[in-house]
Amino acid sequence: MTIDKTFDPAAIESRWYTHWEEEGLFHPERPGADPFTLVIPPPNVTGSLHIGHALDDTLQDILVRHARLKGKDALWVVGTDHAGIATQMVVERNLAKIGQKRTDMDRETFVNKVWEWKAESGGTITRQLRRLGASCDWAHERFTMDEGFSKAVIKVFVSLYNEGLIYRDKRLVNWDPHLGTAISDLEVENREVQGHFWHFRYPLEDGSGEIIVATTRPETMLADMAVAVNPEDDRYKALIGKNIRLPITNRLIPIIADIHADPELGSGAVKITPGHDFNDFEVGKRAGIKPADMLNMLDSHARVIQTAENDVPEELIGLDRFEARQIIVEKIDALGLLDKIEDRVIQAPYGDRSGVPIEPWLTDQWYVDAEKLAQPALEAVRSGKIKIIPESWTKTYYNWLENIQPWCISRQLWWGHQIPVWYTDDGQAIVAENEESAQEKAGQGVNLRRDPDVLDTWFSSALWPFATLGWPDTDPKALGRYPNDVLISGFDILFFWDARMIMQGLHFMKDVPFPKLYLHGLVRAADGSKMSKSKGNTVDPLGLIDKYGADALRFTLCAMESQGRDIKLDEKRVEGYRNFATKLWNAVRFAQNNNCAVNTSKQPPEATLTTNRWIIAETAKVARALDQHIEDMRYDELANSLYHFVWNDFCDWYLELIKPILTSTEDQNQGELQETLAVLGWVIDQILIMLHPIMPFITEELWHALGDRDHDLIVAAWPDYKNWSVDETAQNDIDWLIRLITAIRATRSELNVPPALKVPLHSHGIPEKAAHNLERFDPFIKRLARIESIHKEAAPKGAAAQIVVDEATFVLPLEGVIDLDAERGRLKKAIEAVEKEKTATEKRLGNPNFVARAKAEVVAENRERLNNFTGEITKLKAALERLM
């Protein structure tokens, strides 16, 4: 097949992906081979591919494709999460378009409509994953509401309940009054909003004075149960134990001592509303207030209700919280107890899906005793059974698990795994895997009603590493698929998903779910700012694929993925790596046009020419480095090593060095030509294999374009470099040649020697080895460095530039070519100008106020400028020193 003149990614991507999938090449079918297992973090079934997914899935696909090439039985489990809230909202919005509401139908009817929606529209993100090139085993695709997966979820709930690790309790939750459900911390978005501090004066019961408290939510004062002061605050020590008469309600509440009160903040006194604030809830418990006795003054829609104390004025009952806020402030003011109102920018919690302010709300929910499950998970990391990469996240992991709270797992939704609990008419809870078992436990004839709530989606997805592999019906450990080999995840779900998988895996499988946990950062805009739709700076990965191809996007994400850092995604980088793909395309096309064909040998061809022995050695060197980079999970080094080898070593040097051989018409060179064509074909094969995990489409296309194959590249064999003969002498000799030519080119460029002008090179008194190389490589040096002639005698007097390579000094005579004095003056002025810029930048970065107040991306930009100035000065000084 003749390689097209122009590289067109769109023309090859869908063709090859369809071929791979139809041929079953993503499915593990290598009996006896070492298994390699990876599970994809399941995206929401409602989702579409965003740039974070593209990063996450590219990093995983690189590992899976590499494992396949290494001969492993690679399985990449793919699937989607049922995404309770998100999916229910999508279906409800669709119903609204046709004038229907969820509440107009029974639960079963609505759930059936969700399944209908999934069948019609739920495959968007999996289709988009295919466009990225993700080599998942689609035959093994899972969904967290599948029958088998649901069986695992129910079994885990019942088992944990029977062990006393799941229980029902009254605690504060993040309550979304619009959706009418508890939500997780990850679904809460903290926004900066313009708010107020209302300062109220609370009178003492005995009339002897008052205490000033400040609040951002004055409506909650209806449920205040105490005022807290710091036990070390001398201003209030005498008041501890006395009572406050709470305005409006006229209820007495105590003044208590608690370290939560900060003497340096405001008045140092804090109103305590345990039923509506997470910190206050803990203060209330420390003060001996039982959750069952904590006052609740809001219903599930955030409307005011009567409290257990029955002291809320009737005019407030039924009002929305914000309407009540206004009236309460007016009442406090009318009582003469409003001290002041202070404008303040505050952090307020909002539901990330509903967009409404979240209420800490006291309610009965189902909880997991996470503290007990966390202990083995902590030990797994401490003992080294799980390695977190980058290691810096280990401290965060410890901090979260050492301070873990009970995990609220119930949600007030219709879509999801319905909690397997049935209640008798007298309120007894019966926990069973199905209704038949529950009825047996309760006794025949006993009326049962099922708990209407569903489980948190994080509860089901925590079982992903083993439930996707058939548990509990099949033992993934017996299949060699558990533990999985590694997990790749965004750092933002370290606690919500990763840690919980570790807890559940250790508890039910008695082993860690993975020995390595790799956490990548965020993909940010080019200026370092966080991407958001409101800023209009989001990047559509599919748009980049349309414009530059999937391979270019994948290589960009790989090259920019540096452990512990966020990615600043600049479209120019994607364009640059598209150019890299084009360079590879043109290089292979050049080889084909010069009669290079397939070389299927796993061993390098016999080679006598130094250039051929050198490229074979460099191929072994890079293959070894790539394996190490993958072992260390250094994606940036992986991409950079390949880029340097393909662009520099292979395209810029090897192809240039062998061009005279390929284009020679002399019969006596036929032996050299055949050897070089054999080596060229073999090296191209190794390049395509090594590059395939990052750039699967272009490599598969070129693999087949070079000639007939008995297998696809995706299942080829990784270079077996350990058995190759490597000529270190050839490596050293060509390295010397490259450094000499590079130095001559740099000198010509820095001193403005006309590119087309050929100049002589003098090498008087150089070491014997250098002299030998100079003679051997004479044709290369003359052609590639634009050298007219090479002389062993000293250079003539006059303007000249000297070049040092190891112990050898070479001279380029430049008399009549450049004005030496003018060139010195130009270089000195350039050095002064750059040093001035460098000094100004150093001064700016040395100013603590600038570093503290400037945007992070501005500070980073200045640091980068400083590095560039330093490099430029070094380069200019080197050019000045070369002038003789």
UniProtKB/Swiss-Prot annotation:
Q: Which UniProt keywords apply?
A: Aminoacyl-tRNA synthetase, ATP-binding, Coiled coil, Cytoplasm, Ligase, Nucleotide-binding, Protein biosynthesis
- Positions occupied by motif 'HIGH' region: 43-53
Record GO terms (molecular function): aminoacyl-tRNA deacylase activity; ATP binding; valine-tRNA ligase activity
Its gene is valS
> Which residues take part in binding ATP?
K533
Similarity comment: Belongs to the class-I aminoacyl-tRNA synthetase family. ValS type 1 subfamily.
> What is the main EC category here?
ligase
Organism domain of life: Bacteria
Q: Where is this motif: 'KMSKS' region?
A: 530-534
Any coiled-coil regions, as ranges: 817-884
Q: Where in the cell is it found?
A: Cytoplasm
EC number(s) per entry: 6.1.1.9
Task: Give yes or no: UniProt keyword Heme.
Answer: no
What species does this protein belong to? Zymomonas mobilis subsp. mobilis (strain ATCC 31821 / ZM4 / CP4)
Protein name according to UniProt: Valine--tRNA ligase
**Short name of one Pfam family for this protein?**
Val_tRNA-synt_C
One GO BP on record is:
valyl-tRNA aminoacylation
Q: Which HAMAP family match?
A: Val_tRNA_synth_type1
Q: Give the protein's function.
A: Catalyzes the attachment of valine to tRNA(Val). As ValRS can inadvertently accommodate and process structurally similar amino acids such as threonine, to avoid such errors, it has a 'posttransfer' editing activity that hydrolyzes mischarged Thr-tRNA(Val) in a tRNA-dependent manner.
Fill in the domain comment: ValRS has two distinct active sites: one for aminoacylation and one for editing. The misactivated threonine is translocated from the active site to the editing site.
Q: Which InterPro entries match?
A: aa-tRNA-synth_I_CS (IPR001412), aa-tRNA-synth_Ia (IPR002300), Anticodon_Ia_Val (IPR033705), M/V/L/I-tRNA-synth_anticd-bd (IPR013155), Rossmann-like_a/b/a_fold (IPR014729), tRNA-bd_arm (IPR010978), tRNAsynth_Ia_anticodon-bd (IPR009080), Val-tRNA_synth_C_sf (IPR037118)
Name a GO CC annotation attached to this entry: cytosol
Q: Does the keyword Cytoplasm apply?
A: yes
Instruction: State where it is primarily located.
Output: cytoplasm
Self-association and partners: Monomer.
